[in-house]
Amino acid sequence: MEQQLTFYSYPSCTSCRKTKHWLKAHQIEFNERHLFRETPTREELKYILSLTTEGIDEILATRSQTFKNLNLNIEEMTVNEVLELLIEKPKLLRRPILVDNKKLVIGYNPGELLKLSKKKTVHQSA
């Protein structure tokens, strides 16, 4: 059975709102999770990382004020330390994050979102 699309978002994030609108317009079902209230678990983060092509750099919000304030050197951290940090400070994650059983999309990217829509059975729940 195919895993439903999980959409990690933050309501005041413009990219998240655009992505949500795009998903609804294309009738793609998704399970929305508030990134800061329902932080991804360690296992979910490991799975998300396994779908990246650039590793942690792909999901880390290096331009965020949180990242700048922490003055981190990610290269010196272990994977476990990075995972713990992301669970503790989810504002370090780029958003939105969309993940299903084989595909990951970070940010509002209509071209990448279109790839999701092509592999999903498109139907809207009432």
From Swiss-Prot:
The family database entries (Pfam families) matched by this protein are listed as: ArsC
Outcome, altering C13S: Loss of activity. Strongly diminishes expression of mgsR and of the MgsR regulon
Gene3D superfamilies per UniProt: Glutaredoxin
CDD domains recorded: ArsC_Spx (cd03032)
The listed locations are: Cytoplasm
Instruction: Kindly indicate whether the keyword Repressor belongs to this entry.
Output: yes
Question: What induces the gene encoding this protein?
Answer: Expression is sigma B-dependent. Induced by ethanol, heat and salt stress. Positively autoregulated.
PROSITE patterns on file = ARSC
**Per the record, GO CC terms?**
cytoplasm
Keywords, comma-separated and alphabetical: Activator, Cytoplasm, Disulfide bond, Redox-active center, Repressor, Stress response, Transcription, Transcription regulation
Instruction: Recount the known activity regulation.
Output: Activity is controlled at multiple levels. Regulation includes a positive autoregulatory loop on mgsR transcription and a post-translational redox-sensitive activation step by an intramolecular disulfide bond formation in response to ethanol stress. In addition, protein stability is strictly controlled by rapid proteolytic degradation by the ClpXP and ClpCP proteases. The McsB protein-arginine kinase might serve as a proteolytic adapter for the ClpX ATPase in the degradation mechanism of MgsR.
Q: What is the first-listed, main subcellular location in coarse terms?
A: cytoplasm
Q: List the disulfide bonds.
A: C13-C16
Stated consequence of mutating G55R: Loss of activity. Strongly diminishes expression of mgsR and of the MgsR regulon
InterPro entries given in the database record: Arsenate_reductase-like (IPR006660), Thioredoxin-like_sf (IPR036249), Tscrpt_reg_Spx/MgsR (IPR006504)
What does the UniProt entry report for the null mutant?
Deletion of the gene results in differential expression of approximately 70 genes in response to ethanol stress compared with the wild-type strain.
Alphabetized NCBIfam families for the sequence = arsC_related (TIGR01617), PRK01655.1 (NF002459)
User: What is the documented function of this protein?
Assistant: Regulates transcription of a subregulon within the general stress response. Exerts positive and negative effects in response to ethanol stress.
Instruction: Report the family membership.
Output: Belongs to the ArsC family.
Q: What is this protein called?
A: Regulatory protein MgsR
Gene that codes for this? mgsR
